[in-house]
Amino acid sequence: EQSFIAFLEDSIQKNWDLDALTDYKGATLQYKDVARKIEKLHIIFELSGIKKGDKIAVCGRNSSHWGVTFLATITYGAVIVPILHEFKADNIHNIVNHSEAKLLFVGDQAWENLNEDAMPLLEGIASLADFSSLVSRNEKLTYAFEHRNAIYGQRYPKNFRPEHICYRKDRPEELAIINYTSGTTGYSKGVMLPYRSLWSNTKFAFEVLDLQAGDKIVSMLPMAHMYGLAFEFLYEFSVGCHIYFLTRMPSPK
């Protein structure tokens, strides 16, 4: 059965205590930490009224929290809109508006140049650094950000365990990602990618690449591009690899 999300669920459960994501000169998340962060984002989405099929944008350098945001969005049933952080502010505003994103998760550098008033459809903006709320335009969202840890604690008094994971099953033709290209003329154009595309690329990688759980890899290409996303993050995460992110470019000695 073709389910991309099943790859993710299977990997998190099997590799629970293995290292998953590390930021350059930053913290390491194990697969269980990723699962727990996904769960807290699901609580925010649920309490703030995000529905299946709603769009959630992410814009920032590759990082552990970029990956967590991506995984939380698709396992919830929302559509992820990855945006290259190098895009100019008016292009980012345009993509957020054109995609009709309800939430934007943004890195510190990208956020400095953005203007929230230029993105009127957003219900909220959150920081990729620590998942704190930067802008909230509805009370439910404000409540969700303030109470996510308390609600998580009520739901999982003995913490979140592998058996708690029961992600939805995706359908091959269901929309997973809207990927905006670097527009050569005018603004970027959105490419609509179904789950079939994620599943087939990941399955292809399983067949031709030979990574094992616990192997270490560096994610260098931007995850807002499909190639970097598919072959330096999604496949490796599905295998149980330990992925390192260059959250900033190392300066040459």
Please identify what each model-predicted range represents:
Residues 35-40, 172, 191-212, 217:
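Conserved structural elements of the adenylate-forming
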Residues 1-2:
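Flexible, non-catalytic linker and terminal segments flanking ANL/adenylate-forming cores
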Residues 55, 61-81, 85-89, 97-103, ...:
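A short helix-loop-beta submotif of the ANL/AMP-binding
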Residues 199-216, 223-253:
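Conserved AMP-binding/adenylation subdomain of ANL enzymes
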Residues 48, 75-153:
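Structural core segment of the AMP-binding/adenylate-forming
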Residues 16-17, 143-180, 187, 210-216:
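Conserved pre-ATP/AMP-binding loop-to-beta segment of ANL
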Residues 30-32, 167-168, 176-200:
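Conserved AMP-binding A3 loop
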Residues 9, 17-71, 88-93, 190-196:
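Conserved AMP-binding/adenylate-forming core of the ANL superfamily
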